[in-house]
Amino acid sequence: MDLTLVGQLISLFAVVAAGPLVIVFLSARRGAL
């Protein structure tokens, strides 16, 4: 399997997963949750 393709998929998944996680993390730090 092409490592470049794997790297792109991992990067894409990381960006998609990090978005909501960052929002939840910031909300939790503010005591919103």
Curated annotation (Swiss-Prot):
Segments crossing the lipid bilayer: 5-25
UniProt-listed GO biological process terms: photosynthesis
Record GO cellular component, one term: chloroplast thylakoid membrane
Alphabetical UniProt keywords: Chloroplast, Membrane, Photosynthesis, Photosystem II, Plastid, Thylakoid, Transmembrane, Transmembrane helix
Protein topology in the membrane: Single-pass membrane protein
Classification via InterPro entries: PSII_Ycf12_core-subunit (IPR010284)
Major subcellular site: plastid
Compartments (UniProt record): Plastid, Chloroplast thylakoid membrane
Keyword Metal-binding attributed: no
Pfam families associated with the record: PSII_Ycf12
Family to which the UniProt record says this protein belongs: Belongs to the Psb30/Ycf12 family.
Chain's role: A core subunit of photosystem II (PSII), probably helps stabilize the reaction center.
Record text on subunit structure and interactions: PSII is composed of 1 copy each of membrane proteins PsbA, PsbB, PsbC, PsbD, PsbE, PsbF, PsbH, PsbI, PsbJ, PsbK, PsbL, PsbM, PsbT, PsbX, PsbY, PsbZ, Psb30/Ycf12, peripheral proteins of the oxygen-evolving complex and a large number of cofactors. It forms dimeric complexes.
Protein name: Photosystem II reaction center protein Psb30
Name of the gene encoding the protein in the UniProt record: psb30
